Amino acid sequence: MGTKLGVPNLWEILNKKKIKATFFFTVGPDNMGRHFWRLIKPKFLFKMFRINPFKIYGLNILRSGFIGKGKNIGKICKNEIKSASKDHEIGLHAWDHFSWQTWINMFSKKKIIKHINLGKNALQHIIKYPVTCFASPGWRTNEYVLRTLKNNFNFSYNSDCRGSNLFFPYLGDGKIGSLQIPVTLPTFDEVINIKTTIKKYNSFIIKLIKTQLNFSVYTIHAEIEGMKYKKEFEEFLNIAINEGINFCRLKDLIPKEIENIPIYKINHKTIPGRDGWIAYQQKIIK
């Protein structure tokens, strides 16, 4: 399990480099094994051949929740989550990651609220302080979800989509949603053996960071960079630090004055290397 095994490794690496980061945790059932049913989709099947999931994740992670209900991540990984919370910003990723990523477009308002409440309450019970940020599983959200989150939860920001800069999402009725801090860089599994190789991956990401003017938001996964490729991740940090790249928590990107942060739409699109759609930042609303 990524949280159980990968988070302590990431925590150790980041602390050794004196880097503060933001961790988003899934704290409900581990149903990753249910993604096996997506093998009937050609794009997902190709991705599995491309990244070799058995080598990266291991059989125990891949079979979690394949049949029956997966183990409760928050309960069996509470010590790992609590340790990370002592030095880093903690946010909610999901109660049930698989369910949200697969069916969020069919979720009712009641179900959205239930998922967030279950996750938020479980995470707060572990870390013993309020959860103030949220990141949608698989970068999947929509206007209905954003409105529900804005009206029912007091998150200081969300990180629900891909994009280039801080913005407020337009909700279509003259209102805006909670502040968004979008992810600006691709993930390991999206580009390996498509745009780069494992040996060249760190250089590939560093070059992208240098082309992004304001800031870069880089997503890593405990089950990848915290396990199989933890050595490569530490090498990435060494290169970045030597290149003068600074790291911070996501909340540190929020300016004191937020009145001039622009308003954008959130739309859906597909991207190379990822099965299905993601939410992304689209054209400014005047």
Swiss-Prot record:
Record-stated family: Belongs to the polysaccharide deacetylase family. ArnD deformylase subfamily.
Catalysed reactions, semicolon-separated: 4-deoxy-4-formamido-alpha-L-arabinopyranosyl di-trans,octa-cis-undecaprenyl phosphate + H2O = 4-amino-4-deoxy-alpha-L-arabinopyranosyl di-trans,octa-cis-undecaprenyl phosphate + formate
Entry EC no(s): 3.5.1.n3
GO molecular function, one term: hydrolase activity, acting on carbon-nitrogen (but not peptide) bonds, in linear amides
Pathway(s): Glycolipid biosynthesis; 4-amino-4-deoxy-alpha-L-arabinose undecaprenyl phosphate biosynthesis; 4-amino-4-deoxy-alpha-L-arabinose undecaprenyl phosphate from UDP-4-deoxy-4-formamido-beta-L-arabinose and undecaprenyl phosphate: step 2/2; Bacterial outer membrane biogenesis; lipopolysaccharide biosynthesis
Stored PROSITE patterns: NODB (PS51677)
One term under GO cellular component: membrane
Name assigned to this protein: Probable 4-deoxy-4-formamido-L-arabinose-phosphoundecaprenol deformylase ArnD
Source organism of the structure: Wigglesworthia glossinidia brevipalpis
Function: Catalyzes the deformylation of 4-deoxy-4-formamido-L-arabinose-phosphoundecaprenol to 4-amino-4-deoxy-L-arabinose-phosphoundecaprenol. The modified arabinose is attached to lipid A and is required for resistance to polymyxin and cationic antimicrobial peptides.
Domain NodB homology positions: 1-248
Gene it is expressed from: arnD
